[in-house]
Swiss-Prot record:
Species for this entry: Rhodococcus hoagii
Protein name per its UniProtKB record: Chaperonin GroEL
Compartmental location: Cytoplasm
Enzyme's top EC category: isomerase
A biological process term (GO) from this entry: protein refolding
Enzyme Commission number(s): 5.6.1.7
Annotated Pfam families: Cpn60_TCP1
Family designation: Belongs to the chaperonin (HSP60) family.
Any one Gene Ontology molecular-function term assigned to this protein's record: ATP-dependent protein folding chaperone
Encoding gene (name): groEL
């Protein structure tokens, strides 16, 4: 495909126009009095949202240079969302301010590379200041306040705080759509995975269609079990011990399955067979997780273990196992605490190293099953449009709360950024680097000014007043009052604020140092087709 190329000021201004188009659509949502944006969908009802990254993803511009500019800012929003789960609008507003001030200085003759170095040093200093002033999240109320601000609803904040209190910071909190109105919280005790019994005959409670095994042995096998002779030596040892048996294998079929079922029906021996969760390598990993949790070993030819020679010492233990047709829950596995902690650290390292959102999500689920628990928030609403918007808000708020627990909180409402700017006066920079630091200083005011503007206040007046207030005090845009924001429960996770600034500065530096833009040449629209009837009017068909 043919390309078009723009240089110097033309290239940078084209990118800036794209950035501004996207940022102007996103920034109207900032703050407690921010508005919503309606997004048209090709299929189904339109989406109404105030989430920066969702809005950014939908924007496609026609001009090739503007399109590239918008794509670069989308990257800011997406990266911030990936790292912190919130702060996408703040990141976009900061990027716009940094680029606007930066391009003004480049046009006036400043060296872009000098500005870039100055911006990087200034951002490093502000980040250190934010981390230094962050307050640890110690109470349920602080988590509720942080999540409530993100979701724009204190009830959601309280529910998320309740969920985090129950499952711990390593636990997984998922959000599901509900057919009923309002919000519900469901908690899972122990490790649960989405595979149920292979045969209904294993159920111990016919009415509830579930099998409950008290103090069972747990056999983990990485392959299929089809012949009973493989299983018999081990079954005899378990029967002698007088305990029930849970078998988790790739599959249990044929005479092995029928033998287990017949013994269960006759009351000779209580057992349940379940297929192992996941597929391929993920199945192996999950079996290993269950083995560590229950203190057993996975019987696998890869490690030289076979069913015929397996002894009772290879079996795991748990206080209780509950199996339904759809899922299995293992309560209080008898695994060694140090081994479980080691496995948790290993999974955590894999999460850090992974660059796939899907893999990270699956690893996080495994981590929760081992270290914490799983809470499900069920959200309902009157219409599908409202339901999707509400679900999205809750998901963002959950990630926001987790970020707060991780690195602490700072004053919200753009105040922490503005009140961190004096640290830049201590930097001993000269020339274009000093100008770069000043660009950051100006940009740090942008989020607060936008929040004030969205609340119908005069941005410049608000920024000047907040600058002279004690640290942590600022504008409560919801009420229009100036107060101690942390005491009032208006806070942001420092991880969100820090990520927004770092990602915005990264993209702004790329904008300023760009000297040429190569884009696809827009294709001309095809000429309309002629009249298939050849212009012969008046004919009946």
């Amino acid at each position: 495909m043919a390309k078009i190329i723009a240089f110097d000021e033309e290239a940078r201004r084209g990118l800036e126009r794209g950035l501004n188009s996207l940022a102007d659509a996103v920034k109207v949502t900032l703050g407690p009095k921010g508005r919503n944006v309606v997004l048209e969908k090709k299929w189904g009802a339109p989406t109404i949202t105030n989430d920066g990254v969702s809005i950014a993803k939908e924007i496609e511009l026609e001009d090739p240079y503007e399109k590239i500019g918008a794509e670069l800012v989308k990257e800011v929003a997406k990266k911030t969302d990936d790292v912190a789960g919130d702060g996408t609008t703040t990141a976009t507003v900061l990027a716009q301010a940094l680029v606007r001030e930066g391009l003004r200085n480049v046009a006036a003759g400043a060296n872009p590379l000098g500005l870039k170095r100055g911006i990087e040093k200034a951002v490093e200093a502000v980040t250190a200041k934010l981390l230094d002033t962050a307050k640890e999240v110690e109470t349920k109320e602080q988590i509720a306040a942080t999540a409530g601000i993100s979701a724009g609803d204190s009830t959601i904040g309280e529910l998320i705080a309740e969920a985090m209190d129950k499952v711990g910071k390593e636990g997984v909190i998922t959000v599901e759509e509900s057919n009923s109105f309002g919000l519900q919280l469901e908690l899972t005790e122990g490790m649960r995975f989405d595979k149920g019994y292979i045969s209904l005959y294993f159920a111990t409670d016919a009415e509830r269609q579930e099998a409950v095994l008290e103090d069972p042995y747990i056999l983990l096998v990485s392959s299929k079990i089809s012949t009973v002779k493989d299983l018999l030596p081990l079954l005899e040892k378990v029967i002698q011990a007088g305990k029930p048996l849970l078998i988790i294998a790739e599959d249990v079929e044929g005479e092995a399955l029928s033998t287990l079922v017949v013994n269960k029906i006759r009351g000779t021996f209580k057992s349940v067979a379940v297929k192992a969760p996941g597929f391929g390598d993920r199945r192996k990993a999950q079996l290993a997780d269950i083995a560590i949790l229950t203190g057993g070993e996975v019987v696998s030819e890869e490690v030289g273990l076979s069913l015929e020679t397996a002894g009772i010492e290879l079996l795991g233990r748990a206080r209780k196992v509950v199996v339904t047709k759809d899922e299995t829950t293992i309560v209080e596995g008898a695994g060694d605490a140090d081994a479980i902690a080691g496995r948790v650290n290993q999974i955590r390292a894999e999460i850090e190293a992974s660059d796939s959102d899907y893999d990270r999500e699956k690893l996080q689920e495994r981590l929760a099953k081992l270290a914490g628990g799983v809470a499900v928030i069920k959200a309902g609403a009157a219409t599908e449009v409202e339901l999707k918007e509400r679900k999205h808000r809750i998901e963002d708020a959950v990630r926001n709360a987790k970020a707060a627990v991780e690195e602490g909180i700072v004053a919200g409402g753009g105040v922490a950024l503005l009140q961190s700017s004096p640290v830049l006066d201590d930097l001993k920079l000269e020339g274009d680097e000093a100008t770069g630091a000043n660009i950051v200083k100006v940009a740090l005011e942008a989020p607060l000014k936008q929040i004030a503007f969205n609340a119908g206040l005069e941005p410049g007046v608000v920024a000047e007043k907040v600058r002279n207030l004690p640290a942590g005090s600022g504008l409560n845009a919801a009420t229009g009052e100036y107060e101690d924001l942390l005491a009032a429960g208006i806070n942001d996770p420092v991880k969100v604020t820090r990520s927004a600034l770092q990602n915005a500065a990264s993209i702004a530096a790329l904008f300023l140092t760009t000297e040429a833009v190569v884009a696809d040449k827009p294709e001309k629209a095809a000429a309309p087709m002629g009249d298939p009837t050849g212009g012969m009017g008046g004919m009946d068909f």
